[in-house]
Regions:
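Short amphipathic helix-loop junctions that connect adjacent transmembrane helices
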Residues: 36-50, 236-252
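Cytoplasmic helix-loop-helix junction between adjacent transmembrane helices
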Residues: 110-148
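Conserved MFS/SLC helix-loop-helix module at the cytosolic interface between two early adjacent transmembrane helices
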Residues: 66-102
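Residue-level signature of mid-helix packing/kink "hotspots" within the transmembrane helices
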Residues: 61-69, 151-152
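Juxtamembrane intracellular "pre-TM" segments in multi-pass secondary transporters
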Residues: 2-14, 190-221
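Pair of pore-lining "gating" transmembrane helices in MFS-fold secondary transporters
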Residues: 13-40, 217-230
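C-terminal membrane-cytosol helix-exit motif in multi-pass small-molecule transporters
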Residues: 176-195
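Hydrophobic core of transmembrane alpha-helices in multi-pass small-molecule transporters
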Residues: 25, 94, 105-118
Length: 258
């Protein structure tokens, strides 16, 4: 990786960016794979209703939103690595809980626990710790690309994996991906010698109120919230429409997403 002025990232920076991008990708792939299949396969769970299936699809977002800033702040005090490691273990535990569930409530509990592994802020902070200022934009762009690619891949892999292994098997696969991400953190990602304060990742408690009242950010936050709500709602309606209106068996939905 190199910038427009020809100065290349160091080997350590490249390893950090690649490792953290993989951690992000495996975590997000595991999170997204369930989206195109839960509305159809989830109907076989005890107590399942369209509303509760929708709750299961979006439940992770609630705990993730609530815990994202606290986890980021915690990483300033105890270090990035411990927060990321614990977050991945919590995410894996949530996937394991959902994999063993035989009711929709068990899946909801697992998804809530998955969202509690909110490591995004800590990962971005560690990325800032491990890269120089002139390379930080490129590093964050790589992370962004890994998220986009994992979403696209999940739309195909999710239906295929569920067809092969069932919904429980899909959650076990998600658990395995989280543990693989943990191995990458432990074996590939360099250790930061110091925990620095960065404008990209720092939380200033005294500014939270001002930030929440900022009109431009309010419009942005509401717009993004509506966008995500529509996206999650589409994964409740679209798979069912493909089966009931389109006559397409749920085992073949991956063709549509491909």
């Amino acid at each position: 990786m190199h910038d427009l002025h020809g100065e290349r990232m160091s080997a350590r920076e490249t390893r950090a960016v690649g490792g953290l991008a993989l951690v992000y990708a495996f975590r997000m792939l595991g999170m997204f794979m369930v989206l195109p299949v839960l509305a159809t396969y989830g109907q076989d769970l005890a107590g399942a209703t369209p509303f509760l299936i929708g709750v299961a699809i979006g439940a992770y977002g609630l705990t993730q939103a609530v815990l994202q800033i606290p986890f980021g702040t915690l990483s300033d005090h105890i270090g990035r690595m411990p927060v990321i490691i614990v977050g991945l273990l919590v995410f894996a535990a949530g996937a394991a809980l959902a994999a063993q569930a035989d009711s929709i409530w068990g899946v909801i509990a697992g998804r809530v626990l998955q969202g509690a592994g909110a490591i995004s802020a800590a990962v971005m902070a560690l990325l800032s710790d491990l890269t120089r200022e002139q390379h930080r934009t490129k590093a964050m762009a790589v992370i962004g690309m890994s998220i986009g690619l994992s979403f696209a891949l999940a739309m195909v892999v999710g239906p295929l994996a569920t067809r092969a292994f069932g919904l429980s098997g899909l959650f076990w696969l998600t658990c395995g991906m989280a543990l693989l991400g943990l191995l990458i953190v432990l074996l590939m990602v360099p250790r930061a010698s110091t925990t620095l304060s960065h404008r990209e990742s720092k939380v200033a408690p005294q500014s939270i109120g001002v930030t929440l009242r900022n009109p431009q950010l309010l419009r942005l936050n509401i717009g993004i919230g509506v966008l995500h709500a529509i996206l999650m709602a589409s994964f409740i309606a679209l798979p069912l429409a493909l089966v009931e209106q389109g006559g397409l068996p749920k085992e073949q939905h991956w063709w549509v997403y491909l």
